[in-house]
């Protein structure tokens, strides 16, 4: 935050964890959502956000960083403006915290403008819709739940089923294939995952620190003196914003808005198609729950804040496409205890164009990505938007998988021999379809040892059509697992046949 000349001085009267009560002159009481600033000699200034007016001169604020070391009577300044973040081409390739301070070890970006993180959504007459499909290169997503350009996609799953890996693969695939600008907001997730993401983006060329830095990184170093700022600002296609799980609830509740503000800048002033990745929207809700409890509000269902729906709406309504450009968002949603009826994921559902449900059952079978094709949905899955071939192939895939699921109990009790020839054929093809829905990821190469695959939509449709038409019934099932195109499956199947 920049230090303004119109700041009003006050003093701290109470500190309770991340909550700070402050007193100001009667004619200088800050507004709700205004930023407060506390100077700290040994580190960066502490930024807080006003949440409540307690009386004539007192306000209650939530801190965006640790309040360790604060004392009653200590000076505090009202900035008379909301929290703001730097915007401009200079923020490409950079990492920021919730208040726009760089956390990548590099100097502050030299920008001419900052923008408040609290903004109104675009007016109704500025909005625009799209029937264009955004190709992701991930077979199961492109076929079963195509992503609309400018739409919102939710990735639902419990702990450890692959939400963050899927987000990282989407960043890698879409940034490379479409060369669009991306903004990533890490909300309440592991710091290690943030570090992994940064390294992955540099290795993939989505973030560019220059050739000298890349060479030092490949040799095991991390020499920031070798960063080429001109190349970073012109060639990098992503900006990262983090408010991780070790940070106070204020930071986790606002870092999504920080990332969204940057995405809105690229959309409105750059006239670009922007990708906005949010990992994890549940942590945003969880932070709001903590803040609500700290403010003394009465909880609602399952202990969530009474303002859950309106807070979610404030965030989601800003993620939209205008006549200037589009924001396509991918939001990871942690599902507590794998319960999709929990208020947090249930409230998120209402705002989404696509829902991608990750299945623990598929994960345990080793089918990755573990996306459930029967639970996942898309508003784009219609013949008018996709064309006849794509639509019919997707419906046939869902139909055969549904039939396989219906026969599971019979198979478990009586075995395959009791099925009719027609059902046996359906089961065999469904198992091949299920395995062909898997594919190796670029971001998981170091774990799987298999090179990642980007599969165009046309190849995806061709492959599934061949399986459904029975052209590949002679190939063993394991030939279909973790392959890219159908040609790779045929090649692997022929090799297996020769070995046998």
UniProtKB/Swiss-Prot annotation:
UniProt keyword list: ATP synthesis, ATP-binding, Cell inner membrane, Cell membrane, CF(1), Hydrogen ion transport, Ion transport, Membrane, Nucleotide-binding, Translocase, Transport
Topological type in the membrane: Peripheral membrane protein
Keyword hit for Signal: no
Any single GO CC term annotated in Swiss-Prot or TrEMBL for this entry: proton-transporting ATP synthase complex
EC top class, as a word: translocase
SMART domains linked to this entry: AAA
Compartment list: Cell inner membrane
Catalytic reaction equation(s): ATP + H2O + 4 H(+)(in) = ADP + phosphate + 5 H(+)(out)
Pfam families hit by this protein: ATP-synt_ab, ATP-synt_ab_N, ATP-synt_VA_C
Predominant location category: membrane
Entry GO MF terms: ATP binding; ATP hydrolysis activity; proton-transporting ATP synthase activity, rotational mechanism
Enzyme nomenclature, EC number: 7.1.2.2
Binding annotation for ATP: 157-164
Sequence similarity: Belongs to the ATPase alpha/beta chains family.
Complex formation: F-type ATPases have 2 components, CF(1) - the catalytic core - and CF(0) - the membrane proton channel. CF(1) has five subunits: alpha(3), beta(3), gamma(1), delta(1), epsilon(1). CF(0) has three main subunits: a(1), b(2) and c(9-12). The alpha and beta chains form an alternating ring which encloses part of the gamma chain. CF(1) is attached to CF(0) by a central stalk formed by the gamma and epsilon chains, while a peripheral stalk is formed by the delta and b chains.
General function of this protein: Produces ATP from ADP in the presence of a proton gradient across the membrane. The catalytic sites are hosted primarily by the beta subunits.
Official protein name in the record: ATP synthase subunit beta
Organism: Salinibacter ruber (strain DSM 13855 / M31)
């Amino acid at each position: 935050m920049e230090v303004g000349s119109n700041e009003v001085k006050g003093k701290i009267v109470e500190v309770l964890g991340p909550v700070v009560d402050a007193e100001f002159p009667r004619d200088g009481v800050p507004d709700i959502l205004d930023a407060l600033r506390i100077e700290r000699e040994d580190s960066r200034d502490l930024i807080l956000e006003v949440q409540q007016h307690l009386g004539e001169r007192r306000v209650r604020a939530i801190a965006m960083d640790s309040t360790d070391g604060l004392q009653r009577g200590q000076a505090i300044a009202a900035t008379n403006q909301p929290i703001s973040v730097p915007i401009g081409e200079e923020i490409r390739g950079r990492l920021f915290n919730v208040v726009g301070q760089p956390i990548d070890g590099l100097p502050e970006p030299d920008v001419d403008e900052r923008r408040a993180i609290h903004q109104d959504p675009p007016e109704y007459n500025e909005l625009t819709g799209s029937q264009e499909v955004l190709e992701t290169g991930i077979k199961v997503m492109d076929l079963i739940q195509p992503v609309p350009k400018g739409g919102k996609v939710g990735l639902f799953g419990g702990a450890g089923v692959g939400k963050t890996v899927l987000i990282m693969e989407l960043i890698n695939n879409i940034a490379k294939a479409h060369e669009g600008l991306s903004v990533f907001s890490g909300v309440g997730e592991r710091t290690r995952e943030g570090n992994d993401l940064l390294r992955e983006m540099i290795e993939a060329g989505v973030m560019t620190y220059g050739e000298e830095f890349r060479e030092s990184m490949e040799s095991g170093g991390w020499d920031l003196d070798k960063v080429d700022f001109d190349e970073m600002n012109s060639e990098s296609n992503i900006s990262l914003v983090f408010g991780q799980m070790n940070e106070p609830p204020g930071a986790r509740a606002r870092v999504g808005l920080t990332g969204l503000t940057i995405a809105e800048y690229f959309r409105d002033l750059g006239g670009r198609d922007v990708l906005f990745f949010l990992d994890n929207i549940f942590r945003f809700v969880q932070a709001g729950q903590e803040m609500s409890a700290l403010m003394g509000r009465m909880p609602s269902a399952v202990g969530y804040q009474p303002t859950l729906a309106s807070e979610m709406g404030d965030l989601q309504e800003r993620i939209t496409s205008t006549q200037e450009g589009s924001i396509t968002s991918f939001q990871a949603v942690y599902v507590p205890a794998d319960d999709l009826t929990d208020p947090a994921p249930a409230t998120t559902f209402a705002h989404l164009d696509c829902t991608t449900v990750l299945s623990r059952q598929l994960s345990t079978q080793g089918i990755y990505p573990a996306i459930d094709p029967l639970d996942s949905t898309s508003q784009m899955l219609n013949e008018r938007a996709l064309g006849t071939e794509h639509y019919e192939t997707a419906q046939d895939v869902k139909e055969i998988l549904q039939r396989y699921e219906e026969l599971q109990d019979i198979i478990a009790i009586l075995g395959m021999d009791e099925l009719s020839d027609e059902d046996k054929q359906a089961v065999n093809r469904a198992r091949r379809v299920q395995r062909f829905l898997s594919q190796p990821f670029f971001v998981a190469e170091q774990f799987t040892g298999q090179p990642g695959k980007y599969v165009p939509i046309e190849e995806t449709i061709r492959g599934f059509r061949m399986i459904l038409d029975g052209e590949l019934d002679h190939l063993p099932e394991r030939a279909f697992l973790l392959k890219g195109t159908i040609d790779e499956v045929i090649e692997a199947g022929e090799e297996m046949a020769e070995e046998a």
